[in-house]
Amino acid sequence: MRVPRHFAVHLLSLAFAVAIAFALIEPVPPDLENATQDIVFPIDKLVHFALFLVAAVPWRRSLAVLGVRSPGVAVVVAAAVYGGLLEIAQGLWTLRDAEFLDMAAGALGALVAVGILKALAVRGRGHIAAE
């Protein structure tokens, strides 16, 4: 049986999507919930940002391999939609509240990842062109 050439990147993309779903829908342990209540900065927004920042890298590569015309734009839109759906699920199936800002933090994480990848690609091309 021959494994498709880009199977690993697609599998990694799926693994990140599943891991994010478990992380965001799983109830927060009461000890952790109580420990973070006094923190002024909303740590949950940082978690959403970081999860989608990391996941956007293989997602973008996977979409590029599939031939999506603008994989960066598609990743940001998909992250916003996926984050929104997860927030709805969180509000329906857990004791946690769905928050628009959590979805926005995830989309922003994906946007920053795409921006970093774009900057690295441009910088890499400039370096190659200079040689």
Residue ranges of each PLM-predicted region?
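Bulky hydrophobic segments
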Residues: 1-101, 107-131
